[in-house]
């Protein structure tokens, strides 16, 4: 599911009537290139089209450039949002592949893919915390048999990357585990919300 990031398909500008990217107030450390970064991503849809909202680093003015990835037949495969600060320094990139049957979002920092989120519910909020830009996360987030047209809402409080030698674990912490399990109808929901991290080979 990460192929859209690795195959470098043709990039085309997306018109203003496409999915909108919005910024809201949030936390950011100006020296965060070597420190721990915090972002929150909100994906909303009914189920399509959906909007991608990014937290705004400490209220700074951000320049968001939106591009569309197109396939060999010209079909829109995904959207890429590249976020710059007011000095035109690249902060991070979000790739939204939500135009397939299984929507997905990838967060890319300094050309390193550090978090990939597959989602199918109407709304999912995620906060990614990472300080290992040289590692790439691979794997699916399994939500079981859910209805992507439902109006149910699931909130994920945080995503934490824990490194253990070369084998790392992608751990998700949830505000209310019972509420999450009930929302997706799977008692073992928390156990399924995992992915493996493999060392970035590029």
Protein language model regions, located:
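Low-complexity or membrane-interfacial segments used for flexible interactions
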Residues: 1-80, 86-91, 99-105, 109-202
């Amino acid at each position: 599911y990460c192929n859209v990031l690795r195959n470098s398909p043709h990039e085309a500008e997306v018109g203003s009537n496409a999915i909108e990217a919005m910024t809201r107030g949030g936390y950011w450390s100006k020296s965060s290139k070597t420190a721990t970064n915090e972002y929150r991503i909100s994906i909303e849809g009914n189920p399509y089209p959906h909007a991608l909202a990014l937290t705004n680093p400490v209220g700074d003015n951000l320049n968001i450039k939106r591009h569309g990835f197109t396939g060999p037949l010209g079909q829109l495969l995904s959207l890429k949002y590249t976020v710059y600060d007011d000095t035109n320094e690249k902060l991070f990139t979000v790739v939204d592949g939500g135009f397939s049957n299984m929507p997905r979002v990838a967060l890319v920092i300094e050309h390193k893919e550090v978090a990939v989120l597959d989602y199918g519910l109407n709304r999912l909020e995620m906060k990614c915390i990472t300080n290992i830009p040289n590692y790439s996360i691979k794997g699916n987030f399994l939500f079981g048999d859910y209805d992507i047209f439902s109006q149910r809402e699931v909130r994920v409080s945080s995503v934490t990357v824990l490194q253990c030698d070369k084998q790392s674990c992608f751990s998700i912490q949830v505000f209310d585990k019972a509420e999450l399990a009930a929302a997706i109808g799977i008692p073992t929901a928390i156990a399924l919300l995992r992915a493996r991290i493999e060392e970035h080979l590029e």
